[in-house]
Amino acid sequence: MAGAMVSIVGRPNVGKSTLFNKIMGKRISIVEDKPGVTRDRIYGNAEWLDKKFILVDTGGLDPNAEDILFSKVRLQVEAAIDTSDVILFLVDAKEGLMPEDEEIANILRRAKKEVILVCNKVDSFKEMPPTYYDFFSLGLGNPIPISASNGLGIGELLDEVVKRLPQEELEYTEETIKIAVIGKPNVGKSSLVNKILGEERVIVSNIPGTTRDAIDTPFSKDGKNYVLIDTAGIRRKSRISESIERYSVLRALAAIERSDICLLMIDATEGPTEQDTKIAGYAFENGKGIIIVVNKWDAIKKDNNTVNEYTKMVREKLSFISFAPILFISAKTGQRVHRVLETVDKVWEEYNKRITTGLLNNVLNEAILMFPPPADKGKPLKVYYTSQVGIKPPSFVVFVNEPELMHFSYLRFIENTLRQNFGFEGVPIVISTKKRGEN
């Protein structure tokens, strides 16, 4: 299950980031050529024994993680409890058991979550350091010894992780549209969810939510089935202060992973923030449909040009999701909320759209004739043909003579051509290149 989350927690300097990087290897995709996607390395998609999960380094949640006060370590632990299925509690065999370790253990014991105690900086398994045995007193089971820096014991640790991952969640049918409501705290996510569920002809299912914390609300309207994944609705009163925005990214991430379409909610009185950019970047990189929902529009003083000016500002700040439609609503008054599901339906169609190979190549060949690819170091790029290889999101492979000759700016030209001719509003398009004749 791709949506299972595994968080690494522990006091500063126990090796959280080292363990994170060792497990992830080089598989973290940092996309350089997509401006506007700000990425900090706090999470990555991991896989072990055919089981997929998201690995989160809570230390990376705070830029000053090396010298943070314990109150912030506590916040990281609370964030992990709030959003994770399995928690790796990392301790340091070199320093031994510290009071902060006992504090963290106390919090984790109260949480009804799978916790794996991991003892780092054990350089040899032949003879355990005496400090190793002190950690048994934490009451969290036998510590798994590892050395994150040289990889010792990592395989055994991952074996244990996949054993503890939750069973598959409630499966929805392929036709069910999974909608994540994402955005920073206090932007009106719950208000929007409640307004949508209160609309005419909306029938809310009484199927209970899934095993994880985000509340799933299945419902139907006009014969179509939907599920709202409400990140604001991690209903247990979180002890995380809502003002600490960076921790809310974890909630958004859990919902984004499980969704088809994301409603990115922005506070009209603030405009898009760095936090919004980060959350939008996660949705974009995960290939989700995106609708920008500007809430609290009733609080804005308007003239004839307000919508145009605001749209321009949003487009500039979120330029990497320029394909996303923008809705101006008030969840409080209900203004234009009816357009949310209408737009979801349209984006869902685009998300599932297939273009026949013949039509696709007719359009692209004509565009390539008019604007041939530039030669790189004197060697011309030859584009032979293009195939659509997937949906959700629409994915294409361009077959060429030498893939390394394809410049990202020409890929962008191909993407723009696809959008101008076939729409794809609200969805990212994935384009890769292959040498002709390769499988």
Swiss-Prot record:
<keyword id="KW-0690">Ribosome biogenesis</keyword>
<feature type="domain" description="EngA-type G 2">
    <location>
        <begin position="177"/>
        <end position="352"/>
    </location>
</feature>
<feature type="binding site">
    <location>
        <begin position="57"/>
        <end position="61"/>
    </location>
    <ligand>
        <name>GTP 1</name>
    </ligand>
</feature>
<keyword id="KW-0547">Nucleotide-binding</keyword>
<feature type="binding site">
    <location>
        <begin position="10"/>
        <end position="17"/>
    </location>
    <ligand>
        <name>GTP 1</name>
    </ligand>
</feature>
<dbReference type="InterPro" id="IPR015946">
    <property type="entry name" value="KH_dom-like_a/b"/>
</dbReference>
<keyword id="KW-0342">GTP-binding</keyword>
<dbReference type="Pfam" id="PF01926">
    <property type="entry name" value="MMR_HSR1"/>
</dbReference>
<dbReference type="InterPro" id="IPR006073">
    <property type="entry name" value="GTP-bd"/>
</dbReference>
<comment type="function">
    <text>GTPase that plays an essential role in the late steps of ribosome biogenesis.</text>
</comment>
<dbReference type="InterPro" id="IPR032859">
    <property type="entry name" value="KH_dom-like"/>
</dbReference>
<protein>
    <recommendedName>
        <fullName>GTPase Der</fullName>
    </recommendedName>
</protein>
<dbReference type="GO" id="GO:0043022">
    <property type="term" value="F:ribosome binding"/>
</dbReference>
<feature type="binding site">
    <location>
        <begin position="230"/>
        <end position="234"/>
    </location>
    <ligand>
        <name>GTP 2</name>
    </ligand>
</feature>
<dbReference type="InterPro" id="IPR005225">
    <property type="entry name" value="Small_GTP-bd"/>
</dbReference>
<dbReference type="InterPro" id="IPR016484">
    <property type="entry name" value="GTPase_Der"/>
</dbReference>
<keyword id="KW-0677">Repeat</keyword>
<feature type="binding site">
    <location>
        <begin position="120"/>
        <end position="123"/>
    </location>
    <ligand>
        <name>GTP 1</name>
    </ligand>
</feature>
<dbReference type="GO" id="GO:0005525">
    <property type="term" value="F:GTP binding"/>
</dbReference>
<feature type="binding site">
    <location>
        <begin position="183"/>
        <end position="190"/>
    </location>
    <ligand>
        <name>GTP 2</name>
    </ligand>
</feature>
<feature type="binding site">
    <location>
        <begin position="295"/>
        <end position="298"/>
    </location>
    <ligand>
        <name>GTP 2</name>
    </ligand>
</feature>
<dbReference type="GO" id="GO:0042254">
    <property type="term" value="P:ribosome biogenesis"/>
</dbReference>
<feature type="domain" description="KH-like">
    <location>
        <begin position="353"/>
        <end position="437"/>
    </location>
</feature>
<comment type="subunit">
    <text>Associates with the 50S ribosomal subunit.</text>
</comment>
<dbReference type="Pfam" id="PF14714">
    <property type="entry name" value="KH_dom-like"/>
</dbReference>
<feature type="domain" description="EngA-type G 1">
    <location>
        <begin position="4"/>
        <end position="169"/>
    </location>
</feature>
<comment type="similarity">
    <text>Belongs to the TRAFAC class TrmE-Era-EngA-EngB-Septin-like GTPase superfamily. EngA (Der) GTPase family.</text>
</comment>
<dbReference type="InterPro" id="IPR027417">
    <property type="entry name" value="P-loop_NTPase"/>
</dbReference>
<dbReference type="InterPro" id="IPR031166">
    <property type="entry name" value="G_ENGA"/>
</dbReference>
